[in-house]
Regions:
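Short acidic, Gly/Ser-rich segments with clustered Asp/Glu that frequently serve as metal-coordination loops
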Residues: 12
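Short glycine-/aliphatic-rich beta-strand segments at the starts of folded cytosolic domains
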Residues: 1-9
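Short glycine-aromatic motifs
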Residues: 24-29
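Short amphipathic alpha-helical segment that frequently serves as the phosphate-/nucleotide-binding helix
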Residues: 21
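Short, intrinsically disordered low-complexity segments
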Residues: 30-68
Length: 68
């Protein structure tokens, strides 16, 4: 089962965005679109989401479910 992390980090926090993207790459998450990443480990994504929220960004984690 996969999970999707979507997030938004304010432009003035570009260094934080770089750090988040690097963290996601290191955990082998797959970039679907800018600020939309897919990964199978929910707890890893939750850690990243908390980091994003702690710097003033917004983050959501969705469970991927293929319907058709």
């Amino acid at each position: 089962m996969s999970f999707i992390l979507t997030f938004d980090i304010p432009r003035e926090l570009a260094s934080e965005r770089k750090h988040v993207n690097l963290s996601l790459r290191k955990m082998n998450a797959k970039m679907v679109q800018f600020s939309v990443w897919e990964h199978e480990n929910l707890s890893d994504l939750i850690k990243v989401a908390f980091k994003i929220k702690s710097v003033g960004g917004s983050a959501r984690i969705l469970e991927e479910k293929f319907i058709f």
